[in-house]
Amino acid sequence: MRPARALIDLQALRHNYQLARETSGVRALAVIKADAYGHGAVRCAQALEGEADGFAVACIEEALELRAAGIRAPVLLLEGFFEASELALIVEHDFWCVVHSLWQLEAIEQAAVAKPLTVWLKLDSGMHRVGLHPKDYQVAYQRLQASGKVEKIVLMSHFARADELDCPRSSEQVAVFEAARQGLGAEISLRNSPAVMGWPSVPSDWVRPGIMLYGSTPFEENNSVAARLQPVMTLESKVICVRELPAGEPVGYGARFITDRPMRIGVVAMGYADGYPRHAPTGTPVLVAGQRSRLLGRVSMDMLCVDLTDVPQAGLGSTVELWGKNILASDVAQAADTIPYQLFCNLRRVPLVYCEG
């Protein structure tokens, strides 16, 4: 069997969830959209059920997968519904629903629902992606209350730049949100992972931890909370071939790396078809046989090369960690000019192996 695999540490996942709740001091929805950022939504939900106050996914298809697996905890649809016909399923399965557009509000008003909904009413406080305009927010709230179709409303918005701690934009968004909700007595939810970790003064009754659940920081540098995160995914494979090359020899497609001395090169069963970034440059960190080393040359579809020259204990069959508990996904992402979110979500073809610790 091909040795590439991703180990998913469910104990670390629970630790990170508890850290988010402890840090914020309020209830927390575990964000497991996009198949739990590549970690497997069903298994992650099963590991957290009984501890999590609820879950958040992007769409009804992701939510239905959880219900089919027996997950009974509240599930919030972060993008709400795309067609009015989905409302029947939302009611049937007791999903919570974001309302971010006037057409969704009108659909609820016109729907014949068997029981009232829980709605998270989203304000566009400055990200300008989805959300109601501040001038429409109070009216939308009043219309939902008057509709007879809604039993609870939570007020929410989303930060655009909370991962930039010196940027005033988040404070400006809070001010817009506070002005828009003035006089409304509902619960609120503003804080995502960077806001949980870096903006403790932002008010919230609910937080929505995403990337921090999986043990990765949204910040370029660690802070006190980031230092306590535990990586959940360890992407690893093995050395399947060893080459002894003299100085001046090219390695891989395009001869992007030329040996500058006699070198030992390890070929690893991992490539961009598995989700490892093709544009990761020479020097991207890896761990080989327990020792830190580096990527060499261009990443191929199914293979990549690593430097074994100064790792004498490494050889055929040695384990290579591409990211995980020793090689942080954020370090790989920085080297490859991407973000940990994309590394995790791009993972494919690699089997997920679940473990506890």
Curated annotation (Swiss-Prot):
Catalytic activity: L-alanine = D-alanine
Gene it is expressed from: alr
Enzyme Commission number, as recorded: 5.1.1.1
Enzyme class: isomerase
Pathway(s) the chain acts in: Amino-acid biosynthesis; D-alanine biosynthesis; D-alanine from L-alanine: step 1/1
Positions of the catalytic residues: K33 (proton acceptor), Y253 (proton acceptor)
Protein name according to UniProt: Alanine racemase
Binding site for substrate: R129, M301
A Gene Ontology BP annotation from the UniProt entry: D-alanine biosynthetic process
Functional note: Catalyzes the interconversion of L-alanine and D-alanine. May also act on other amino acids.
SMART domains: Ala_racemase_C
Residue list for modification N6-(pyridoxal phosphate)lysine: K33
Requisite cofactors: pyridoxal 5'-phosphate
This protein's record includes keyword Isomerase: yes
Gene Ontology MF annotations: alanine racemase activity; pyridoxal phosphate binding
Keywords: Isomerase, Pyridoxal phosphate
